[in-house]
Amino acid sequence: MKNQDQALIFEVTKEGRVGYSLPKLDVEEVKLEDVFESDYIRVEDAELPEVSELDIMRHYTALSNRNHGVDSGFYPLGSCTMKYNPKINENVARFAGFANIHPLQDEKTVQGAMELMYDLQEHLIEITGMDTVTLQPAAGAHGEWTGLMLIRAYHEANGDFNRTKVIVPDSAHGTNPASATVAGFETITVKSNEHGLVDLDDLKRVVNEETAALMLTNPNTLGLFEENILEMAEIVHNAGGKLYYDGANLNAVLSQARPGDMGFDVVHLNLHKTFTGPHGGGGPGSGPVGVKADLIPYLPKPILEKTENGYHFNYDRPEAIGRVKPFYGNFGINVRAYTYIRSMGPDGLRAVTEYAVLNANYMMRRLAPFYDLPFDRHCKHEFVLSGRRQKKLGVRTLDIAKRLLDFGYHPPTIYFPLNVEECIMIEPTETESKETLDGFIDKMIQIAKEVEENPEVVQEAPHTTVIKRLDETLAARKPVLRYEKLAPVQV
């Protein structure tokens, strides 16, 4: 069977074929009718695939070869920090004392796990400059929502019920206004200036007595450090608002600068990005939230505390916003992040930022002659290009991204941030070698030349992938959401 004709597992079924023989039943046999009501019992057998173990192995191995991950190739997805995840993290996460415990166990039986969580909180407090941290939130956007709910609780506790607006820059992550809306706020956009930074005059214009918070990423999504952050913090605080730090780009400032020292009141982190939890496949993530002292009473319960008798969860939190997740966060990702932090140490984390910034600036300068550079200045961990000159020749940024697939690269983030036309956002991370960067750069230059000399090659890409270009409009308007049974394929 050709690779492009890879069948679904349901299509390789052969009646009577089995993968395993089960041992004899060693407990009393029970009829389903004696356990479940008839409404919950199938009338007909489920149409499950009948395949051998070899069929299964070959099927899923073939599918895995179609996947692209950081272990298989360069993954320069801007604003996603697709760095290599050290495998020591996986070894530690599989320790029996971490992998084989249950969240409903008595606290006395999981003191080691609780100690790890407590120590991780302490490390994150030091890294961010916050006063305390909760590990409950499951991922970045969940952390955003949690942080905004804390800000809302703070204002309401102080009688400021009219603070209903959250300010976000025009370069913000899309989750920022979404999280604000879900938390019950109205979002107000502040413009960027010609340098790609928040326009201070526009910020002064939109800040008022209705301002609950300003949400920022620093460096911002253009990869630029908000150099006026202290003045911005003063503007917001003088108006009675809070400053929220989206930790998506923390990889750019590790051990170099701390959000708490910039004036931020709330911060969420992405342990699955900055601190090497594997991500990109839908989860799990971990989005701890750190706060300054005046927001501590509202943290979700329980909070993890250390006493002379060990570690325990404190549920006595009358002002807390409640729970934001069952139990206490995604523990497995927390173990991986803790392992990474302890392995790297302060000097190692500082080096992470130095190499991430160096790699990004190197790539930006090499690519600048071939693509438009909207903001011609040093970047931090990521940078944005524009495909405006290619668009004038009939080739879109989407076409460039598709062409990269032919060379085995995952495309960068495209069309984001929204305030850059034909945007291409590239984040190389610190874990990639110069040889890898040069290989990607060479292909980007090749594509730029193809646009000028043979644009059809780019417009019709990809050419070498199993699946060619999809009709994305048709897929959006007429999606096929259910499996449609076909005739069995002979293998």
Curated annotation (Swiss-Prot):
GO molecular function: glycine binding; glycine dehydrogenase (decarboxylating) activity; pyridoxal phosphate binding
The protein's required cofactors: pyridoxal 5'-phosphate
Matching Pfam families: GcvP2_C, GDC-P
Paired cysteines (S-S): none
Gene3D superfamilies reported for this sequence: 6.20.440.10, Aspartate Aminotransferase, domain 1, Type I PLP-dependent aspartate aminotransferase-like (Major domain)
Modified residues (N6-(pyridoxal phosphate)lysine): 273
SUPFAM superfamilies the record matches: PLP-dependent transferases (SSF53383)
Alphabetized UniProt keyword annotations: Oxidoreductase, Pyridoxal phosphate
Any one annotated GO CC term: cytosol
GO biological process: glycine decarboxylation via glycine cleavage system
Catalytic activity: N(6)-[(R)-lipoyl]-L-lysyl-[glycine-cleavage complex H protein] + glycine + H(+) = N(6)-[(R)-S(8)-aminomethyldihydrolipoyl]-L-lysyl-[glycine-cleavage complex H protein] + CO2
Signal peptide: none
Function (record text): The glycine cleavage system catalyzes the degradation of glycine. The P protein binds the alpha-amino group of glycine through its pyridoxal phosphate cofactor; CO(2) is released and the remaining methylamine moiety is then transferred to the lipoamide cofactor of the H protein.
Similarity section: Belongs to the GcvP family. C-terminal subunit subfamily.
SUBUNIT field: The glycine cleavage system is composed of four proteins: P, T, L and H. In this organism, the P 'protein' is a heterodimer of two subunits.
Protein name as annotated: Probable glycine dehydrogenase (decarboxylating) subunit 2
Organism: Bacillus mycoides (strain KBAB4) (Bacillus weihenstephanensis)
Taxonomic path: Bacteria, Bacillati, Bacillota, Bacilli, Bacillales
